[in-house]
């Protein structure tokens, strides 16, 4: 009887040990769902893996909006542990759906308050960029025209058939630009954002589904016939970076109109039901460290939120708007679909 008791006790101890280790074994793989533009050096990911005895799996799920939709569909039983790339245009929907667990990173003291996405720390800011108009310098020089200094000018004859934008229903920069026009013109004034878009339609604005098609096909710098495109304030710097010859200035420029640029902040959140929560928390801390923060600017052409992180030298060809659109994530979350529906009726139908 004593032998049986000792044997049973041994079995219980073994089972208890296995159970206690089970979470650790599960914690060895971290799955990060993100957008297709996500790009971090393999050696940086490897550093995290080696430091944590773990494997990182990057799960790309389309653009930021598509990744969010997938995370919502998987709510409570996610295929990933983290969602990277949720920005302030989609933040409201993500918080309403309650797909994230809260986590306050110890590294947040390195992040200025203006990049805070939500006070409950369900989404942690990682990077930021500015969405605005870019212009083709050579085209404007040849045409003898100056870059616009107000959005109202875009509805004039000088800019007829010269602007390409992205569809805000399916494009992140397209949505950011739409939101900027809402902030700039308002919704209830004598001339509001929808009046502006009606005038743009009458002025033959071109609408494309994605940034790549608009920038690399229709933008005149890349062979198209439109010298104005919705892009990013870092795009002129990217033109210098990718040039086959050394440049002393960018062939493109930024149109930085007060109140008409959009500060886009990307963040990361731990998905509810994640298998590897402790590892996910460590990755968020790692993503805010300078090693990670200094790796992505020359790959994703966005700025680090860590105030101690440095940007590449070619970022001097980028510009930082002094007065981006003043509109809160809460208002965006509340009215985003309304704005998109109204825009679609005015511009596409």
Task: Give the role of each language-model region.
Residues 17-20:
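C-terminal motif of bacterial Sec signal peptides marking the signal peptidase cleavage site
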Residues 22-93, 222, 349:
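Early extracytoplasmic/lumenal segment of secretory-pathway proteins
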Residues 42, 64-100, 108-119, 217, ...:
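Pocket-flanking alpha-helical
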Residues 78-83, 101-138, 152, 162-168:
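A structural signal for short loop-to-beta-strand junctions that line the ligand-binding cleft
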Residues 88-99, 118-146, 174-184, 263-269:
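Periplasmic solute-binding protein
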Residues 100-109, 123-124, 152-155, 233, ...:
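Short beta-strand->loop
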Residues 173-255, 259-260:
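Ligand-binding pocket segment of bilobal, Venus flytrap-like solute-binding proteins
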Residues 266, 271-327:
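Mature extracytoplasmic/periplasmic domains
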């Amino acid at each position: 009887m004593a032998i049986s008791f000792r044997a049973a006790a041994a079995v219980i101890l073994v089972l208890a040990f296995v159970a206690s280790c089970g979470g650790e074994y599960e914690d060895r793989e971290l799955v990060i769902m993100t957008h297709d533009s996500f790009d971090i050096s393999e050696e940086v990911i490897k550093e995290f893996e080696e430091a944590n005895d773990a494997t990182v799996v990057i799960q790309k799920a389309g653009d930021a909006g598509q990744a969010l939709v997938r995370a919502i569909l998987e709510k409570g039983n996610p295929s990933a542990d983290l969602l990277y790339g949720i920005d302030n245009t989609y933040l409201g929907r993500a918080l309403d759906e309650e797909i994230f667990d809260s986590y306050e990173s110890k590294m947040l003291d390195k992040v200025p308050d203006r990049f805070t996405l939500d006070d409950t720390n369900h989404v942690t800011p990682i990077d930021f960029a500015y969405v605005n108009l870019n212009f083709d310098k050579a085209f404007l020089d040849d045409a003898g025209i100056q870059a616009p200094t107000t959005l109202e000018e875009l509805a004039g004859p000088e800019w007829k058939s010269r602007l390409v934008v992205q569809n805000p229903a399916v494009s992140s920069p397209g949505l950011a630009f739409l939101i900027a026009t809402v902030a700039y013109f308002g919704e209830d004034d004598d001339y509001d954002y929808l009046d502006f878009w009606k005038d743009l339609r009458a002025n033959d604005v071109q609408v494309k589904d994605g940034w790549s098609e608009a920038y690399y096909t229709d933008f005149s710098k890349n062979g198209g016939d439109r010298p104005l495109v919705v892009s990013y304030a870092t795009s002129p710097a990217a033109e210098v970076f990718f040039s086959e010859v050394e440049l002393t200035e960018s062939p493109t420029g930024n149109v930085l109109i007060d109140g008409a640029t959009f500060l886009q902040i990307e963040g990361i959140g731990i998905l509810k039901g994640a298998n590897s929560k402790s590892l996910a928390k460590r990755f968020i801390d790692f993503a805010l460290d300078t090693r990670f923060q200094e790796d992505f600017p020359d790959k994703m052409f966005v700025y680090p939120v860590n105030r101690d992180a440095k940007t590449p030298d070619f970022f001097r060809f980028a510009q930082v708007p002094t007065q981006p659109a003043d509109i809160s994530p809460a208002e965006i979350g509340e009215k985003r679909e309304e704005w998109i529906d109204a825009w679609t009726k005015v511009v596409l139908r």
